[in-house]
Amino acid sequence: MREFGLITRRLVTALLVGLGLMASTTIAAAEAIKVAAIYTLPVEQQWISRIHKALNTAAERGAIEYVYSENVANTDYERVMREYAEQGKQLIVGEVFALERAARKVAKDYPNTAFLMGSSFGPVGPNFSVFDNWIHEPSYLSGMVAGSATKSNVIGMVGGYAIPEVNRLLHAFMDGARAVNPDVKFIVNFIDSWYDPPKAKESAFAMMDAGADIMYAERFGVSDAAVERGVKAIGNVIDTSGDYPDTILASAIWHMEATIDKAIKNVSGGSFEAADYGQYSFMAYGGGSLVLDEKLVPADVVKAVRDKEAEIMDGLFRVNVNDQRPVSDN
């Protein structure tokens, strides 16, 4: 349900499934920790949606009591953090890429509150932990699919911002494509927005006009352009193949559950401390995966991709991490 006050938020109450005994319900509720999340975008946005999904899953099993605020302006973010801390939330989750210094200042003022924030920088003791969607591994695999599928040998890539968290995914995708197709060329553009589907769509059309027949959809809007032009696309973070049938060849999926569950366990056990939770987005921890449409991807390509996936999972192949801004090929 939605609460109204200084902050507009929704409260997700844990759904306690059991025998229906009052005693059992009371015990489960007492064990649930109080968690708040702060989002600068709507929970429907792809990156935010994965965090929201993981927290909802934890709430549904009775592990947490979950409230959240969405569409919080950067200028208001610090105030919202402080309000949740004052309310006694035990764990506060969010993303502070645009306000790193302010967020760390709040954490310092509330040393008994656990903070887990999407961040470009490192953790700060005793209570400020960081995470990111390290899905470079499935991004590499999706690149293999794209490199095998292109006929024009031109792939278009539309990103949000050229920050390390985005750059590394694009580079991994490019490396995967080049591994199976050394002749492939890339057209790269950043729209300087996390959510502007019309702008992303316009950028995608320009790339198609320049010869791209496969589109890497790091942002919403690109797949819509692909559908209109009848070209194929690669998804990112979430699986949108149901929304774009016969268009999405493969997608690199981010699963935030491993990260959230680790943080909840640490808070519940009194062992939460400043740490980098990034590794829990790796495939080995279940934080990343590849989905592909076997109706659209040839069997030999599927096998090659799955074989490489097994190598990654077994520690026999390591995807390179490159945080530098990717550029178009000449």
Annotate each PLM feature.
Residues 13-24:
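Bacterial N-terminal signal peptides
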Residues 34-61, 67-77, 97, 162-168:
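Extracytoplasmic "Venus flytrap"
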Residues 36-37, 89-96, 116-118, 210-220, ...:
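Periplasmic-binding protein-like
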Residues 55, 141-184, 188, 276-298:
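An alpha-beta-alpha
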Residues 62-71, 181-194:
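Short beta-strand elements in bilobed, periplasmic/extracellular small-molecule ligand-binding domains
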Residues 108-133, 237-247:
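Flexible loop/hinge segments that line or gate small-molecule binding clefts
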Residues 123-145, 157-162, 245-258:
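Short beta-strand elements at the ligand-binding edges of bilobed clamshell
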Residues 268-330:
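Hinge/cleft segment of the Venus flytrap/periplasmic-binding protein
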